[in-house]
Amino acid sequence: MKVVIPVAGQGTRLRPHTHTVPKAMLHVAGKTIIEYILDEVYAVEPDEYIFIIGYLGDKLRPFLEKKITKPVRFVVQGETLGIAHALHQARDYLKDDPFLIVLGDTIFQADLGRIVKKGVSAIGVRVVDDPRRFGVVVLDGERVMKLVEKPQAPVSTLAIAGVYYISDPGLLVDSISRVVEGDIKTRGEYQLTDALQLMVEAGHDIETFPIEGWFDCGEPSALLETNRALLARVEEVPKRPGSIIIPPVWIDESAAIQNSIIGPNVSAAGGAIIKDSIVRDSIVSEYAAVEALILQGSIIGDRATAQGRPASLNVGDSSQVELA
Protein backbone atom coordinates (compact mmCIF):
# COMPACT_ATOMS: atom_id res chain seq x y z
CA MET A 1 0.00 0.00 0.00
CA LYS A 2 1.08 3.54 -0.73
CA VAL A 3 1.01 6.57 1.54
CA VAL A 4 0.72 10.02 -0.02
CA ILE A 5 1.87 13.00 2.05
CA PRO A 6 1.48 16.53 0.61
CA VAL A 7 4.15 18.83 2.09
CA ALA A 8 4.38 21.61 -0.49
CA GLY A 9 2.85 24.43 1.56
CA GLN A 10 4.83 27.52 2.49
CA GLY A 11 3.68 27.71 6.12
CA THR A 12 3.24 31.49 5.89
CA ARG A 13 1.66 31.77 9.36
CA LEU A 14 4.84 30.33 10.88
CA ARG A 15 7.19 32.90 9.40
CA PRO A 16 9.99 33.80 9.99
CA HIS A 17 10.76 30.16 10.88
CA THR A 18 9.52 28.85 7.53
CA HIS A 19 11.61 31.30 5.54
CA THR A 20 14.45 28.79 5.75
CA VAL A 21 12.95 25.56 7.14
CA PRO A 22 10.01 23.61 5.66
CA LYS A 23 7.04 23.57 8.00
CA ALA A 24 7.17 19.77 8.22
CA MET A 25 10.74 19.97 9.57
CA LEU A 26 9.99 22.31 12.47
CA HIS A 27 10.80 20.79 15.86
CA VAL A 28 8.28 20.19 18.60
CA ALA A 29 8.86 18.16 21.78
CA GLY A 30 11.96 16.42 20.50
CA LYS A 31 11.06 15.55 16.92
CA THR A 32 10.09 17.21 13.68
CA ILE A 33 6.43 17.38 12.69
CA ILE A 34 6.98 14.96 9.82
CA GLU A 35 8.67 12.42 12.12
CA TYR A 36 5.56 12.30 14.32
CA ILE A 37 3.46 11.70 11.21
CA LEU A 38 5.76 8.94 9.98
CA ASP A 39 5.59 7.24 13.38
CA GLU A 40 1.82 6.83 12.91
CA VAL A 41 2.10 5.74 9.28
CA TYR A 42 4.70 3.03 9.98
CA ALA A 43 1.93 0.97 11.61
CA VAL A 44 0.41 0.11 8.21
CA GLU A 45 3.78 -0.94 6.73
CA PRO A 46 3.56 1.04 3.47
CA ASP A 47 5.23 -0.35 0.35
CA GLU A 48 5.92 3.13 -1.00
CA TYR A 49 5.85 6.73 0.18
CA ILE A 50 4.88 9.54 -2.16
CA PHE A 51 5.70 13.06 -0.99
CA ILE A 52 4.31 16.02 -2.88
CA ILE A 53 6.90 18.73 -2.41
CA GLY A 54 7.28 22.33 -3.47
CA TYR A 55 8.50 25.14 -1.25
CA LEU A 56 11.94 24.25 0.19
CA GLY A 57 11.54 20.74 -1.19
CA ASP A 58 15.30 20.55 -1.70
CA LYS A 59 15.66 20.48 2.10
CA LEU A 60 12.88 18.00 2.72
CA ARG A 61 14.03 15.48 0.15
CA PRO A 62 17.40 14.46 1.68
CA PHE A 63 15.92 14.56 5.19
CA LEU A 64 13.16 12.11 4.24
CA GLU A 65 15.43 9.85 2.22
CA LYS A 66 17.52 9.31 5.35
CA LYS A 67 14.50 8.62 7.56
CA ILE A 68 12.64 6.11 5.37
CA THR A 69 13.95 2.70 4.30
CA LYS A 70 11.11 1.85 1.89
CA PRO A 71 10.89 3.27 -1.66
CA VAL A 72 10.24 7.01 -1.68
CA ARG A 73 8.92 9.02 -4.62
CA PHE A 74 8.88 12.81 -4.82
CA VAL A 75 6.40 14.74 -6.96
CA VAL A 76 6.72 18.49 -7.39
CA GLN A 77 3.73 20.82 -7.04
CA GLY A 78 4.83 24.01 -8.79
CA GLU A 79 2.00 26.14 -7.40
CA THR A 80 0.20 25.57 -4.12
CA LEU A 81 -3.36 25.58 -5.40
CA GLY A 82 -4.95 23.20 -2.91
CA ILE A 83 -4.75 19.56 -1.84
CA ALA A 84 -6.71 18.27 -4.84
CA HIS A 85 -4.25 20.09 -7.10
CA ALA A 86 -1.34 18.53 -5.20
CA LEU A 87 -2.75 15.02 -5.62
CA HIS A 88 -3.46 15.73 -9.28
CA GLN A 89 0.29 16.10 -9.82
CA ALA A 90 0.75 12.53 -8.56
CA ARG A 91 -2.22 11.02 -10.41
CA ASP A 92 -0.11 8.66 -12.55
CA TYR A 93 1.07 6.87 -9.39
CA LEU A 94 -2.30 6.61 -7.65
CA LYS A 95 -4.60 4.77 -10.05
CA ASP A 96 -4.10 1.14 -9.11
CA ASP A 97 -3.98 0.34 -5.38
CA PRO A 98 -5.73 1.66 -2.27
CA PHE A 99 -3.73 4.33 -0.47
CA LEU A 100 -3.59 6.63 2.52
CA ILE A 101 -3.49 10.41 2.27
CA VAL A 102 -1.95 12.15 5.27
CA LEU A 103 -1.53 15.92 5.29
CA GLY A 104 1.98 16.82 6.35
CA ASP A 105 1.27 19.65 8.78
CA THR A 106 -0.75 18.11 11.62
CA ILE A 107 0.37 15.67 14.31
CA PHE A 108 -2.27 13.02 14.97
CA GLN A 109 -2.96 9.63 16.55
CA ALA A 110 -5.28 7.03 15.06
CA ASP A 111 -5.64 3.29 14.59
CA LEU A 112 -4.70 3.31 10.91
CA GLY A 113 -4.12 -0.43 10.84
CA ARG A 114 -7.78 -1.10 11.66
CA ILE A 115 -8.96 1.28 8.95
CA VAL A 116 -6.76 -0.26 6.27
CA LYS A 117 -7.76 -3.79 7.30
CA LYS A 118 -11.47 -2.92 7.03
CA GLY A 119 -10.90 -1.82 3.43
CA VAL A 120 -13.63 0.84 3.18
CA SER A 121 -12.85 4.43 2.20
CA ALA A 122 -12.76 6.51 5.36
CA ILE A 123 -12.00 10.01 6.61
CA GLY A 124 -10.42 10.77 9.97
CA VAL A 125 -12.59 13.19 11.97
CA ARG A 126 -12.65 14.94 15.31
CA VAL A 127 -15.39 16.92 17.07
CA VAL A 128 -14.53 20.64 17.28
CA ASP A 129 -16.13 23.66 18.91
CA ASP A 130 -15.70 25.98 15.91
CA PRO A 131 -16.16 24.10 12.61
CA ARG A 132 -15.79 27.28 10.55
CA ARG A 133 -12.00 26.75 10.50
CA PHE A 134 -12.18 23.27 8.98
CA GLY A 135 -13.67 21.08 6.33
CA VAL A 136 -16.50 19.08 7.90
CA VAL A 137 -18.55 15.97 7.14
CA VAL A 138 -22.28 15.43 7.48
CA LEU A 139 -23.24 11.83 8.23
CA ASP A 140 -26.20 9.65 7.31
CA GLY A 141 -25.81 6.86 9.83
CA GLU A 142 -22.20 5.70 9.50
CA ARG A 143 -21.69 7.00 5.98
CA VAL A 144 -20.64 10.41 4.76
CA MET A 145 -23.50 12.19 3.05
CA LYS A 146 -21.90 15.59 2.47
CA LEU A 147 -18.56 17.36 2.80
CA VAL A 148 -18.33 21.12 3.27
CA GLU A 149 -15.14 23.20 3.31
CA LYS A 150 -15.03 25.71 6.19
CA PRO A 151 -18.79 26.31 6.53
CA GLN A 152 -19.79 29.72 7.83
CA ALA A 153 -23.20 28.39 8.84
CA PRO A 154 -22.88 25.35 11.14
CA VAL A 155 -23.77 22.08 9.41
CA SER A 156 -21.64 19.69 11.49
CA THR A 157 -19.06 19.67 14.26
CA LEU A 158 -17.15 16.73 12.75
CA ALA A 159 -13.98 18.31 11.40
CA ILE A 160 -11.87 16.58 8.77
CA ALA A 161 -8.50 15.94 10.40
CA GLY A 162 -6.33 15.49 7.32
CA VAL A 163 -6.13 11.67 7.21
CA TYR A 164 -7.93 9.68 4.50
CA TYR A 165 -8.07 6.05 3.35
CA ILE A 166 -9.08 5.58 -0.27
CA SER A 167 -10.29 2.11 -1.33
CA ASP A 168 -11.19 3.12 -4.92
CA PRO A 169 -8.15 5.02 -6.21
CA GLY A 170 -9.39 5.21 -9.78
CA LEU A 171 -12.59 6.97 -8.75
CA LEU A 172 -10.70 9.49 -6.62
CA VAL A 173 -8.21 10.22 -9.41
CA ASP A 174 -11.10 10.76 -11.84
CA SER A 175 -12.92 12.99 -9.33
CA ILE A 176 -9.80 15.06 -8.72
CA SER A 177 -9.33 15.45 -12.48
CA ARG A 178 -12.92 16.73 -12.76
CA VAL A 179 -12.23 19.29 -10.04
CA VAL A 180 -8.91 20.53 -11.42
CA GLU A 181 -9.61 20.33 -15.15
CA GLY A 182 -13.11 21.71 -14.62
CA ASP A 183 -11.63 24.59 -12.60
CA ILE A 184 -13.90 23.87 -9.64
CA LYS A 185 -12.54 25.98 -6.81
CA THR A 186 -13.71 26.58 -3.26
CA ARG A 187 -12.18 29.52 -1.44
CA GLY A 188 -9.78 29.99 -4.32
CA GLU A 189 -8.29 26.47 -4.25
CA TYR A 190 -8.88 23.00 -5.66
CA GLN A 191 -10.20 21.21 -2.60
CA LEU A 192 -9.99 17.51 -1.82
CA THR A 193 -13.38 17.84 -0.12
CA ASP A 194 -14.96 18.70 -3.49
CA ALA A 195 -13.42 15.60 -5.09
CA LEU A 196 -14.60 13.40 -2.23
CA GLN A 197 -18.09 14.90 -2.56
CA LEU A 198 -18.11 13.81 -6.21
CA MET A 199 -17.24 10.28 -5.06
CA VAL A 200 -20.16 10.33 -2.61
CA GLU A 201 -22.51 11.56 -5.35
CA ALA A 202 -21.28 8.71 -7.57
CA GLY A 203 -22.49 6.25 -4.93
CA HIS A 204 -19.14 5.46 -3.31
CA ASP A 205 -19.38 4.64 0.39
CA ILE A 206 -17.13 6.71 2.66
CA GLU A 207 -17.11 6.20 6.41
CA THR A 208 -15.35 8.07 9.21
CA PHE A 209 -12.94 7.05 11.95
CA PRO A 210 -11.91 8.90 15.11
CA ILE A 211 -8.66 10.82 15.40
CA GLU A 212 -7.69 10.34 19.04
CA GLY A 213 -4.95 12.93 19.28
CA TRP A 214 -4.92 15.95 16.99
CA PHE A 215 -2.32 18.64 17.40
CA ASP A 216 -2.35 21.75 15.26
CA CYS A 217 1.01 23.14 14.13
CA GLY A 218 -0.25 25.91 11.87
CA GLU A 219 0.91 29.02 13.75
CA PRO A 220 3.35 29.86 16.57
CA SER A 221 0.80 29.77 19.40
CA ALA A 222 -0.54 26.42 18.18
CA LEU A 223 2.98 25.02 17.85
CA LEU A 224 3.73 25.99 21.45
CA GLU A 225 0.45 24.47 22.64
CA THR A 226 1.30 21.24 20.80
CA ASN A 227 4.73 21.31 22.41
CA ARG A 228 3.09 21.52 25.85
CA ALA A 229 0.65 18.69 25.08
CA LEU A 230 3.33 16.32 23.80
CA LEU A 231 5.75 17.12 26.60
CA ALA A 232 3.06 16.14 29.13
CA ARG A 233 3.69 12.55 28.00
CA VAL A 234 7.42 12.70 28.69
CA GLU A 235 8.18 10.93 31.96
CA GLU A 236 11.97 11.14 32.03
CA VAL A 237 13.49 14.22 33.64
CA PRO A 238 16.89 15.04 32.11
CA LYS A 239 19.69 16.06 34.42
CA ARG A 240 22.07 18.91 33.75
CA PRO A 241 24.60 19.65 36.53
CA GLY A 242 24.60 23.29 37.55
CA SER A 243 21.11 23.93 36.17
CA ILE A 244 17.56 23.50 37.45
CA ILE A 245 15.21 21.39 35.30
CA ILE A 246 11.47 21.75 35.91
CA PRO A 247 9.48 19.03 34.10
CA PRO A 248 8.03 18.39 31.69
CA VAL A 249 10.90 19.12 29.34
CA TRP A 250 12.75 17.41 26.53
CA ILE A 251 16.45 18.12 26.11
CA ASP A 252 18.50 16.44 23.41
CA GLU A 253 21.63 14.68 24.63
CA SER A 254 23.78 16.99 22.52
CA ALA A 255 22.17 20.19 23.85
CA ALA A 256 24.33 22.16 26.30
CA ILE A 257 22.61 23.66 29.35
CA GLN A 258 24.73 25.87 31.60
CA ASN A 259 23.72 27.76 34.75
CA SER A 260 20.08 27.98 33.70
CA ILE A 261 16.54 27.23 34.80
CA ILE A 262 14.72 25.19 32.16
CA GLY A 263 11.01 24.41 32.23
CA PRO A 264 8.31 23.67 32.45
CA ASN A 265 7.25 22.93 28.85
CA VAL A 266 10.57 23.45 27.11
CA SER A 267 12.11 21.43 24.29
CA ALA A 268 15.75 21.95 23.33
CA ALA A 269 16.87 20.26 20.12
CA GLY A 270 20.23 18.81 19.17
CA GLY A 271 23.18 21.17 19.37
CA ALA A 272 21.23 23.88 21.21
CA ILE A 273 23.08 25.97 23.79
CA ILE A 274 21.30 27.63 26.72
CA LYS A 275 23.48 29.60 29.11
CA ASP A 276 22.73 31.87 32.07
CA SER A 277 19.02 31.94 31.18
CA ILE A 278 15.53 31.19 32.41
CA VAL A 279 13.44 29.43 29.76
CA ARG A 280 9.86 28.18 30.04
CA ASP A 281 7.05 27.33 27.61
CA SER A 282 9.43 27.57 24.67
CA ILE A 283 11.03 25.68 21.78
CA VAL A 284 14.77 26.04 21.20
CA SER A 285 15.63 24.53 17.82
CA GLU A 286 18.75 22.82 16.47
CA TYR A 287 22.05 24.61 17.10
CA ALA A 288 20.26 27.67 18.46
CA ALA A 289 22.03 29.67 21.18
CA VAL A 290 20.29 31.42 24.08
CA GLU A 291 22.37 33.41 26.55
CA ALA A 292 21.51 35.72 29.45
CA LEU A 293 17.78 35.85 28.69
CA ILE A 294 14.43 35.23 30.31
CA LEU A 295 12.25 33.48 27.71
CA GLN A 296 8.59 32.54 27.90
CA GLY A 297 6.31 31.49 25.04
CA SER A 298 9.16 31.73 22.54
CA ILE A 299 10.35 29.81 19.49
CA ILE A 300 14.04 30.12 18.67
CA GLY A 301 14.77 28.85 15.16
CA ASP A 302 17.58 26.66 13.86
CA ARG A 303 21.03 28.21 14.31
CA ALA A 304 19.49 31.43 15.65
CA THR A 305 21.20 33.40 18.42
CA ALA A 306 19.24 35.15 21.16
CA GLN A 307 21.47 37.02 23.55
CA GLY A 308 20.81 39.46 26.36
CA ARG A 309 23.20 40.95 28.82
CA PRO A 310 23.98 39.91 32.38
CA ALA A 311 22.78 42.19 35.16
CA SER A 312 23.86 42.71 38.74
CA LEU A 313 20.97 43.50 41.07
CA ASN A 314 20.78 44.69 44.68
CA VAL A 315 17.17 44.06 45.67
CA GLY A 316 15.77 44.72 49.13
CA ASP A 317 13.20 42.74 51.09
CA SER A 318 9.63 42.54 49.75
CA SER A 319 10.69 44.06 46.45
CA GLN A 320 9.66 43.01 42.95
CA VAL A 321 11.85 43.30 39.87
CA GLU A 322 10.63 42.62 36.34
CA LEU A 323 13.22 42.19 33.59
CA ALA A 324 11.93 42.93 30.11
Residue ranges and their predicted role:
Residues 107-183:
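Conserved core of the sugar-phosphate nucleotidyltransferase
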Residues 14, 60-64, 172, 176, ...:
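Hydrophobic packing residues within well-ordered alpha-helices of enzyme cores
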Residues 25, 137-139, 208:
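A structural signal for short hydrophobic beta-strand segments in well-ordered beta-sheet cores
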Residues 178-324:
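Left-handed beta-helix
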Residues 10, 105-106:
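Active-site metal-binding loops of divalent metal-dependent hydrolases
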Residues 11-16, 132:
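Short N-terminal binding/cap micro-motifs at the start of the first secondary-structure element
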Residues 50-54, 125, 283, 299:
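Short internal beta-strands
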